[in-house]
From Swiss-Prot:
Record-level GO cellular component terms: nucleus; P-TEFb complex
Pfam families referenced in this protein's UniProt entry, alphabetically: Pkinase
Name of the protein in question: Cyclin-dependent kinase 9
BP terms from Gene Ontology: positive regulation of protein localization to chromatin; positive regulation of transcription by RNA polymerase II; positive regulation of transcription elongation by RNA polymerase II; transcription by RNA polymerase II
MF annotations from Gene Ontology: ATP binding; cyclin-dependent protein serine/threonine kinase activity; protein serine kinase activity; protein serine/threonine kinase activity; RNA polymerase II CTD heptapeptide repeat kinase activity
Record flagged with keyword Transcription regulation: yes
Organism, scientific name: Gallus gallus
Upper lineage: Eukaryota, Metazoa, Chordata, Craniata, Vertebrata
Subcellular localization, as worded in the UniProt entry: Nucleus
Residue ranges with Polar residues bias: 352-366
């Protein structure tokens, strides 16, 4: 059971009634998110209701951790926490008030934008998206915070074209292992389709490379418009990773055989790395292909970090990164994954390019081949 902290009454918080809810824009295991406006100023905000699973036990430690992290992080490319609000305890809510986190409102999330076929990103605009995303990661990692849930739905974009990393509900502080004692963080983090191979193999002493893998998945998605590896289970996800990034072996990933799961699981053997080959039907820019390839490296120790990624030729070659504001100004409606038609399995799932010369039956990949 998660530790809890008895802070439900939150006596120093304003009442959430100062805001008027306008629309529900998100729903998940974390609770609900609403678009709202300040009744006096008209300022638009997002209200994230803290899910009180075990109300008797007080305020969830996971929410406290998120609040503490958001109060620490102040950066243009990280979502801004304005304040914490509450509802009054009353007989109508079993004498238990609710807690809301109040954020600056962002008009879109990246999953919602990618689900809309009318939204077209130019190469310059994709460069700007990735530059802002990597800037956000560089900042949080420099402040010793791991996001641990990188995915397109957690990347917000304002109407002015400013990207904000959001949903720090799974985030945590990290440190370098001390006195040869490895860290023992949970590996049950990161949405499956964006989860890196080290977590899938059970690693608990991990760091910033887990977020960079998610960044690579998101970067590829800017062209494919759907998550590039849609596994059903952890083993299935590792199979898809092996089919795209090559077989997981000690030759490409030293000491990978230390993982108990590596010994237990039957992972595809003899798979060649084909990140660039599989993506080149969608991604025409060679620098973009190279950066995606460097982000989707199996061995976390060899995966590119945010600093080196920001210095990659992709960002310093023509066309240069360009502002998103003009493109977004042609779209009046907010776009969020929650409000969009499914873009996942089936949806706009990109198909395997026809001229690959591959026989799925012969390679026994029919069941697993959900990459493209």
């Amino acid at each position: 059971m998660a530790k809890q902290y008895d802070m439900v009454e939150c006596p120093f918080c304003d009442e959430v009634s100062k805001y008027e809810k306008l629309a529900k824009i998100g729903q998940g295991t974390f609770g609900e998110v609403f678009k709202a406006k300040h009744r006096q100023t008209g300022k638009k905000v997002a209200l994230k209701k803290v899910l009180m699973e075990n109300e008797k036990e007080g305020f969830p430690i996971t929410a406290l951790r998120e609040i503490k992290i958001l109060q620490l992080l102040k950066h243009e490319n990280v979502v801004n926490l304005i304040e914490i609000c509450r509802t009054k305890a009353s007989p109508y809510n079993r004498c238990k008030g609710s807690i809301y986190l109040v954020f600056d409102f962002c008009e879109h999330d990246l999953a919602g934008l990618l689900s809309n076929t009318h939204v077209k990103f130019t190469l310059s605009e994709i460069k700007k998206v990735m530059q802002m995303l990597l800037n956000g990661l560089y900042y949080i990692h420099r402040n010793k915070i791991l996001h641990r849930d990188m995915k397109a739905a957690n990347v917000l974009i304002t109407r002015d074209g400013v990207l904000k990393l959001a949903d720090f509900g799974l985030a945590r502080a990290f440190s370098l292992a001390k006195n040869s004692q490895p860290n023992r963080y949970t590996n049950r983090v990161v949405t499956l389709w964006y989860r890196p191979p080290e977590l899938l193999l059970g690693e608990r002493d991990y760091g910033p490379p887990i977020d960079l893998w998610g960044g690579g998945c998101i970067m590829a998605e800017m062209w494919t418009r759907s998550p590039i590896m849609q596994g059903n289970t952890e083993q299935h996800q590792l199979t898809l990773i092996s089919q795209l990034c090559g077989s997981i072996t000690p030759e490409v990933w030293p000491n990978v055989d230390k993982y108990e799961l590596y010994q237990k699981l039957e992972l595809p053997k003899g798979q060649k790395r084909k990140v660039k080959d599989r993506l080149k039907a969608y991604v025409k820019d060679p620098y973009a292909l190279d950066l995606i390839d460097k982000l989707l490296v199996l061995d976390p120790a060899q995966r590119i970090d945010s600093d080196d990624a920001l210095n990659h030729d992709f960002f310093w070659s023509d066309p240069m990164p360009s502002d998103l504001k003009n493109m977004l100004s042609t779209h009046n409606q907010s776009m969020f994954e929650y409000l969009a038609p499914p873009r996942r399995r089936g949806g706009h799932m990109p198909q395997q390019p026809a001229n690959q010369g591959r026989n799925p039956a012969a390679t026994n990949q029919t069941e697993f081949d959900r990459v493209f």
